[in-house]
């Protein structure tokens, strides 16, 4: 029999999972219906709604932005995460390591909406980075005022906000490696860089899998940062699939909104499940 303490811990998770699963299934079912708040009897239309959504420019544009952002953040986030974790790992002072780690994960301790507001102020031409550039004799940079730099600015903010996740998992992986191996390499005169790519990185596959999965999920389903930076949902240069879904709800295109939500969930699930299964298999083998 299950212990009482185990039941108390498992029950809330099971209830939450059941509610979440119900909502996902309900959303998927409603995506095959033509419905609105004024229509008490939704009518079945099959894949017609999906066909309409897929043919729209906004959907393909927003989905492309989500995919591009995911790929860029996964690549840059992992690279920066590894090097930040390595710098923290090779610090001799635990106090210094804790201080710098707090700085790295600071963006994760506040909401993404607040992160977006901070960068919105930094991009302000009167009080932000551009003001400083002018003061030192450099030209201003059109962070959010040019269509060609809006998306790169979103990428910059996203990398700053989420790289700490990767760094945290890589540092945990590095710290879990047998220190005698690292010390032996140091005694042999091996440089820190060689220790990193010959010992630390090869033994941190679990960290890579988890960091990649989380970076993908956060970037593919990003909402707060582009919403704050663009000031709404209709800026096509910063519109992600989540923003487009929210926009459809605000204009009461509920059938199309549920279809977009279902496709977002399906894409994320298809990509994440193999990662989850890989991690589970590795833990079972251990």
Curated annotation (Swiss-Prot):
Pfam families recorded: BPD_transp_1
Any one GO cellular component localisation term in the record: plasma membrane
InterPro entries: GlcT_permease, MetI-like, MetI-like_sf, Sugar_ABC_transporter
GO biological process: transmembrane transport
UniProt cross-references to SUPFAM superfamilies, sorted A to Z: MetI-like
Membrane topology: Multi-pass membrane protein
Alphabetical UniProt keywords: Cell membrane, Membrane, Sugar transport, Transmembrane, Transmembrane helix, Transport
Residue ranges of the TM segments: 6-26, 71-91, 103-123, 154-174, 199-219, 260-280
Domain ABC transmembrane type-1 as annotated: residue spans: 63-275
Entry keyword annotation includes Transmembrane: yes
Positions of disulphide bridges: none
Compartments, as annotated in UniProt: Cell membrane
Top-level taxon of the source organism: Archaea
Assembly: The complex is composed of two ATP-binding proteins (GlcV), two transmembrane proteins (GlcT and GlcU) and a solute-binding protein (GlcS).
Functional summary from the UniProt entry: Part of the ABC transporter complex GlcSTUV involved in glucose uptake. Responsible for the translocation of the substrate across the membrane.
Family per record: Belongs to the binding-protein-dependent transport system permease family.
Protein name listed in UniProt: Glucose import system permease protein GlcT
Organism per entry: Saccharolobus solfataricus (strain ATCC 35092 / DSM 1617 / JCM 11322 / P2)
Name of encoding gene: glcT
């Amino acid at each position: 029999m299950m212990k009482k303490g185990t039941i108390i811990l498992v029950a809330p998770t099971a209830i939450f999972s059941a509610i979440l699963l119900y909502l996902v299934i309900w959303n998927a079912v409603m995506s095959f219906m033509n419905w609105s708040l004024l229509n008490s009897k939704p009518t079945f239309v099959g894949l017609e709604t999906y066909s309409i959504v897929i043919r729209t420019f906004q959907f393909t544009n927003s989905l492309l932005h989500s995919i591009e952002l995911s790929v860029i953040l996964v690549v840059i986030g992992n690279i920066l995460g590894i090097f930040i974790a390595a710098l923290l790992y090779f610090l001799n002072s635990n106090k210094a390591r804790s201080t710098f780690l707090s700085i790295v994960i600071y963006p994760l301790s506040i909401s993404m909406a607040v992160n977006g507001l901070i960068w919105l102020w930094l991009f302000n031409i009167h009080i932000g980075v551009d003001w400083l550039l002018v003061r030192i004799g450099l030209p201003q940079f059109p962070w959010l005022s040019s269509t060609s730099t809006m998306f790169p600015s979103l990428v910059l903010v996203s990398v700053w906000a989420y790289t700490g996740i990767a760094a945290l998992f890589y540092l945990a992986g590095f710290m879990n490696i047998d220190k005698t191996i690292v010390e032996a390499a140091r005694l042999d005169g091996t440089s820190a860089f060689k220790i990193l790519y010959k010992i630390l990185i090869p033994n941190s596959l679990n960290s890579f899998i988890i960091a990649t999965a989380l970076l993908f999920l956060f970037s593919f389903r990003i909402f707060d940062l582009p919403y704050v930076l663009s000031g709404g949902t209709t800026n096509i240069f910063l519109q992600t699939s989540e923003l487009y879904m929210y926009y459809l709800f605000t204009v009461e295109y509920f059938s199309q909104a549920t279809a977009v939500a279902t496709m977002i969930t399906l894409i994320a699930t298809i990509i994440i499940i193999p990662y989850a299964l890989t991690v589970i298999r590795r833990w079972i083998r251990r």
